[in-house]
Amino acid sequence: MQIRKIAPASVCARIALVLALLSLIFAAEPTNLAAQSLKPMVFAVSATDVSASPIFVAEHLGLFKEEGIDAKIVVIRSDIVMKGLVTGDVDFASSVSSVVKAAAIGAPVRTLINFFNGSFFYLVTKPDVSNISQLKGKTVAISRYGSATDFDARAAFRHFNLDPGKDVQILAIGGGPTRIAALVSGRVDSAILNNIEKIPAEKAGMKSLLFTGQYLRQPVGGLGAGVQRTAEKREEIRRSLRAMYRALTIMKADRNRIKPVFEKRLDVRAENFDAIYDDAMRVFLPSGEIDLADLAAPYEDARSQAPTAPPVPLASVVDYSILQEVRKTVR
């Protein structure tokens, strides 16, 4: 399975390029009867990291194929993939935080399954920082405003009685490699990095000061889909969710079975696997469902940014009906 990163200049161009690439993939595949019987489904992930790991587990272990699904995994920024969900060009988006935010202001999308109820982020600092209070008046790098990195940073600073709007300067500068480079070069004083990204930062002499995932419950990783697509392709959605729930069951029960997946798909070194796996299990959702209260951060952020949006109850941003069906069929 090739994982393609999509980075064109505009939203429409990005979605168009996804479709063009997928058509090439389809054309290049063998035309035997087994391949023809599989139903293609497009899974958009925002990054090849732990948040999307259950998708890679299901793909690597052949669970999608066993359920009759040909999973096409593409990498698209979470803030632009919502258009693809609404139009049906993308079947699933793994950034459920973005799905919740879109649904919260009336977009016809829903979260169908959740993987984690917290992040794997760390506050990583320059080596001379020994206490978070030393970051008062300093800078912290996140990916973008309204992202999980943003929510985690603010929650961590509030926990230690620092006002993230006044006491520290939060800078949205982009992806993990950009944040690592900014921290190591001294352009920022700290950065929110996930448990894979922090490893090269530590090797460069930086310090993982604290695990920020412990201070905020929020949706991290899962599958969201368009309402219309879910109705039109209910059987394919059901099969996909069954594969995903089977992957969750395996991840919880057998770390040794998924270790090769982390090494091959997420580029996790063998010596780092146990620590990364343990971080994931701190916030793992084996049932695939999340408490509604844990959706508050993205939901309230979206509502605050769109005060004229129509009323949308928090409970309506998720739809676990198909997941609940498939859970009964997995032993």
Residue spans for each PLM region:
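N-terminal secretory signal peptides that target proteins for export/translocation
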Residues: M1-C12
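Ligand-binding clefts/hinges and TM-proximal coupling segments of bilobed small-molecule sensing domains
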Residues: A148-K166, A243-A275, A315-V318, R327-V330
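Secondary-structure end/capping motifs
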Residues: E232-P310
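Short, glycine-/small- and polar/acidic-enriched structural segments
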Residues: Q36-S185, D189-N195, M206-R217
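Pocket-lining segment of extracytoplasmic ligand-binding domains
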Residues: S98, P177-L266
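Sec/Tat signal peptide C-region and signal peptidase I cleavage site
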Residues: E29-A35
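Bacterial N-terminal signal peptides
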Residues: C12-E29
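Periplasmic-binding protein-like
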Residues: V45, F115-T125, E202-K233, I237, ...
